[in-house]
Design a protein with these regions (language model features):
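Short loop->beta-strand "edge-of-pocket" segments that line small-molecule binding or catalytic clefts
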Residues: 28-32, 50, 129-143, 158
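Extracytoplasmic small-molecule ligand-binding "clamshell" domains
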Residues: 22-93, 102, 234
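Short helix-initiation/N-cap motifs at beta->coil->alpha
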Residues: 54-55, 69-80, 125-126, 142, ...
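Flexible hinge/capping segments at coil-to-helix
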Residues: 22, 119-137
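Ligand-binding clefts/hinges and TM-proximal coupling segments of bilobed small-molecule sensing domains
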Residues: 67, 145-160, 200-201, 228-248
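Periplasmic-binding protein-like
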Residues: 34, 112-119, 184, 188-229, ...
């Protein structure tokens, strides 16, 4: 039997009724910051955008009769680009927060993400208390719930936030910070990518529900919620979670 990696990944809400939505073959553009494996990334073998979020959106589109074209967009401008109509939706591991819900619409959660802290391999014994009480510094990508969590742990004065995740990793490697707050869903990929140098040392922190994002008032939200309920009900979502996070 397959066992899911313990990074607080779980179904978000019970499955609802089967979809009756039909978007009539609509071609939707989807903004995504493709630097966050396995959620979304550039497949080096094909040059194509791939990942869990891509598969989820495509699976929903198969249920509600639409197609998705993914567009790489930097996180720092992704919501402004959505608002300006550069694309129709965002699928980029976006946490659902009250502040964001004031200015954009979300689907129901499609997965729950438990945040984690990436540290240097030599420091993998660090605990959360070490960060809270010993003047340790944290980094995270700016304008994310990761950055908010970092501030809550070590205080604003001990957080270095960068526009890109790669800049945060460089700060960790250079010794400018002692850890980087990340989406726990990305942890296994980072353990593999940075093996021997960096490691996910602290896991299962704050749990964030993730949702697909639309402009305020977009009627497609209802259709995507129906499609999401259907892929939860028919086992598709289980299969996708197993594809990216389960181990034998």
């Amino acid at each position: 039997m397959m066992k899911k990696i313990s990074i607080a990944l779980a179904f978000a809400l019970a499955a609802g009724p089967l979809s009756a939505a039909d978007l009539g073959g609509a071609a939707l553009k989807v903004g995504s910051d493709t630097t966050s494996p396995p959620m979304e990334f550039i497949d080096t073998a094909t040059g194509q955008i791939a990942g869990f979020d891509v598969d989820v959106v495509n699976a929903i589109c198969a249920k509600i009769n639409c197609t998705a074209e993914f567009v790489t967009t930097g996180w720092d401008g992704i919501f402004a680009a959505l608002d300006q109509g550069s694309f129709d939706m965002v699928a980029s591991g976006v946490s659902i927060t009250e502040e964001r819900q004031k200015v954009m619409d979300f689907t129901e959660p499609y997965i729950i993400n438990g945040q984690a802290i990436l540290v240097r391999a030599a420091d993998q014994g660090l605990t959360l208390d070490d960060f809270r009480t010993n003047g340790k510094k944290l980094s995270a990508q700016a304008n994310t719930t990761d950055a908010e969590l970092a501030t809550s742990i070590v205080g604003d004065g001990n957080v270095l936030a960068y526009d890109t995740f790669n800049a945060s990793v460089l700060a960790l490697k250079n010794g400018d910070v002692d850890g980087v707050v990340i989406n726990g869903a990305n942890g296994p990929a980072y353990d593999k990518e940075f093996a021997g140098e960096l490691v996910v040392g602290i896991k299962d922190l704050q749990s964030d529900p993730l949702g697909l994002v639309f402009r305020k008032g977009d009627p497609n939200v209802a259709a995507f919620n129906e499609g999401l309920a259907e892929i939860k009900a028919d086992g598709t979502m289980d299969a996708l979670i197993a594809k990216y996070w389960a181990v034998q």
